[in-house]
Amino acid sequence: MDRLISAIKEKGYSTVGLADHQVLFGVPEFATLTKKHQIQSIIGIDIVYPKMLVTFFAVNELGYRELIQLSHIAQEGLISNHRFQSKNKNIIAVVSPLQSSIFKEPFDQLALYLNTHLSGIALTYVGIENYPDSDEKPIQLYREFAKKYSYPTVAFPHIRYGKPNDAIILDILQAIHRGETLTIKEKLGGQYLPTLEEIQQRYLPEEIIETTNIANGCRFNFFVKRGQLLSFQSGTSSQDLLREKSIEGLQSRPIDFTQMAYLERLDYELTMIEQLGFADYFLIVADFIQYAKQQRIMVGPGRGSAPGSLVAYALGITEIDPLPHQLLFERFLNPSRKTMPDIDTDFADKDREKIIEYIRKKYGDDRVSHIITYQTIQAKQAIRDIGRVYKFSNTSIELLSKALGDGKLDLRSSYKKLPAFQKHFDEDPECAEIVKLAHKIEGFIRQSGMHAAGIILNETPLHQSLPLIKQGPKVITQYEMNHLEAQGFLKIDILGLRNLTIIETCLNQLNHQGIQLDLKTIPMEDNQVFQLLRTGLNMGLFQLESDGMKRAMKTIQIDRFSDLVSLIALYRPGPMDNIESYARRKQGLEPVTYLDNQLKPILNPTFGIIIYQEQIMQIAQTMAGFSLAKADDFRRAISKKDNETMLALKQSFLDGAVSKGYKSDHALSVYNHILKFADYGFNKSHSVAYATLTYQMAYLKTYHPDAFYASILNSSAGTSDTKLMGYMDELRTLKIKLMPPNIQTPSTQFIIQDHQLIAPLTLLKGIHPELVLRIQKVRLQGPFADFFDCVTRLYPLDVTLQHHSSLIDAGAYDVFGLPRATLRASLQNAMKNAAIQSTFLDEQTGLLPPTSLPKIPMVEAEDKPFENLEKELDVTGMILSQSVLGNYRQPKNGPVIPTIQESKRTNQVVTTG
């Protein structure tokens, strides 16, 4: 759209209108770009009636809200029954004869149709579309009708692309959307952006004048606040309630509430929150988190900058006390910016929808919505889409896709920077043709989706002020997140975190064993936990699973919680270059230096290295005398490379430092050092929160490994978790036995029995949870006496020959002490026997009576171990009976050898043999 708006500006147009098909998807970007190019924008929507297409334009705010209603009505298929209030001056209607079948009917019927549907609108036009290839006869007919029935005509070309040869782009995009194919690769179309001279040639003077009249009549401003912060439902003022709950909450925390530092910090934060009008926001978030905890839903310790707030800690929104970690409130809520703070919340992923449902019930369905996202066509997708639309050879498509690597570069940059891609383009004509076509569609929106975490809440029904659309059963906004926030709608991120589900499952396993564990009370400086981390046994640990992170743990010889916080901040492209220096300084192998001695208290915890954004803020406060609010503005400006703001704040920093007695050249040196690290600074609040979550998982793994691994494996079952083999390798290293499924202990999850992990029956292909639950009921009547007893008792459950075959191959029947080959050879006879014997089953107990038909003998066969393992792998996706690699072990304190999956990051794997 940017290119099109730029072209409109270049051709001398002062006003442009936009109308999407029954939606308002493009409005925010359109309004933003026209404002940027100083062009007046007119907001509209195309509405399809059974026999006509009408474009409605918003004259004012009320008109815009009518467009929102029209979008909703059209999506519901109710537009034919909709009537406008008499003398409606809030919207303008333009009927498009060229795209309306009603214009083929007699004038009197046409006039009646328009009058029926549009009579309430004060100003209705007949839109004249005249393109280079248009037939003049129908256009003249439209003008005659308009004149006869007193409808003004207006120049109304539907512009679909910038230049005539761009018509093929539209065709390709439509073919992608419809799943169709094309043969033509070039096309000239008439719905391009005409010059002003072409407009004058194609339309009557009065029709051009009417475009000016519409422009003058439409004075709607898109850039106003329409969202209203939801009021927390209570019988007292939100400010009073927030203060009361904060004081009560802090008193219940394991801290000395009488300390002046806590009292002053709490009062300061509450005052800022009250002044900025955010009390309701905090109460709303605290309420649904409290609900989650009451429902025993696992809640994360915090995320983002919210752990920097003592109020958030007091309300139970976070589990991080900001004072001992030197976390800053202003990093979370800067009073000088007056923008809504972000309180992102993590819940066990399996329960995320329960939280959203609670919010819907509490505040009303019409006040809550999911948020739309738009996916654009990136380089690899463009190649694949062109390949499908034009049926190019799969060989060429795969060659180009592979040459694009991770696909992060656009096609033009890929040609310049990726030799293999350039070679295919230069030497293969088909590849060159694919790339040229792909380049045409690159960057266009391909499809919409739903934001993974965000929802919006509003005081009034959303459909009154915001266009919505249904995506399956869910209602989502038509505007993306950044535009919603700009319009004042409250966004809350409710994230589902698999790691919280793992922790919750692990704690439940421990509860079943009679072990009650409260993670809030575990010691945070446990040597055994750090010993585990140093060994590199980090599979399943949040943030720590990569081989690079394992090496980093060994490099710094992690032995304290602050190391973990630092590593989570450092282990990113750029900052990770400092890991070696951090390790050497910590171990006394490199001198610890500071930018200035007065900055030692700030930089000492990180051995003189700037790691956190909060440190930049504290340096600005200490050296230049900035308030923390101004220091946060300083941090934001340099991290976002906001040159204009940076220039002013740089001078302010230097002046402030000089006024505090620092030499100007020294102050400049510190400023330049900050500038160097600004790109790499990490949010310490987020790092502390996620380090806490990571440490909790490490604690469980250290002291309750069987329950931990059971939880990890349960979370991986049925997924494409590529780390599964890594989990199993660690189990062998720790001498924790992972056993095949066992028909005597049928389960839908990995279970712990005698310090062994037993795989669930649902691990098998074709064995569904419902069937396992029925097997459990049979097993509760008594143990299976032998193979024949088992097959007979399961016969009424419709456990098929294939089911039994899979159970044999998985090792579920190994408990009967017979070779798997024998069980396979005897299965047919067992099924025949079961068909007869099952008629004798006791209806009450489900057991065979002591006297029944004689058992038939087993058909003995010799096991072939590798065949067994092959079949086991086929039905379960893993080998549980024994390790194929035998006695291989990675040295406990040796170098970390990456898996092939990890090595794919460098596209290099070295093998020996």
Where does each model-flagged region fall?
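Hydrophobic or amphipathic alpha-helical targeting/insertion segments
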Residues: 29-77
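Domain-core and long-helix interface of multi-subunit machines
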Residues: 1-18, 22-37, 72-164, 255-284
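Phosphate/diphosphate-binding loops
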Residues: 42-45, 53, 161-166, 174-216, ...
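Histidine/acidic-residue-rich catalytic or RNA/ligand-binding cores of hydrolases
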Residues: 51, 137-139, 163-173, 313
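Noncatalytic, beta-rich nucleic-acid-contacting surfaces in large DNA/RNA-processing enzymes
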Residues: 2, 14-18, 161, 237-913
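Glycine-rich loop at the start of a catalytic domain that most often binds anionic cofactors/ligands
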Residues: 24-39, 167-171, 313-323
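Structural signature of the thiamine diphosphate
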Residues: 206-232, 376
